[in-house]
């Protein structure tokens, strides 16, 4: 390097040095919402065969890892999974395998090796309290296609757990595990009903930040226990305090 020349880190190198990854909750028997999106929000599932291929990968992953799939929905450019790992660290291992396997097969099918990433980043996740908050998240996930205007009724979306749950018996590959708590009565009708503004804002905030989703006491307790306190703090720089000064009188 010549004298006076500045060494510039690539964006990825800078991110690795300056922006350490936030902690992630990944404990056995916890319940987690996991999400990933196509790179630059690009379409990942272009046709029916793409959805079928991903569900096949999900089935393979569920056989390979000690983890349960409780709820899911595949959308054209992203997917939602609600999972319960049975071993510590199994959520991350499962999601890493799912993402890597799907990326490899996607590139092989579309002949796009070397043309960029399929997903925009590593998956996002947040822990969920196993009570009515779990049911809210499942309604949020299972009505995703309805909210996006892709169907008129949530149960019409073929690529998700609501449609699959309504089929008797469940089609192969078998993906869904029993829920830890009972569904609300008239579950399909409840999924078709919109979440209220408070519920929507809370779920989206937790998905964005990795913040535990539950009542205030549970969320704060879990954040402390799992070293997720940073997810509970307000984002952005603190506001500057404006100090009113008295004008100096000339003598």
Language-model-detected regions and their locations in the chain:
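Short Pro-Cys-Gly-centered "Cys-loop" motif that presents a nucleophilic cysteine in a tight turn
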Residues: 1-75, 84-251
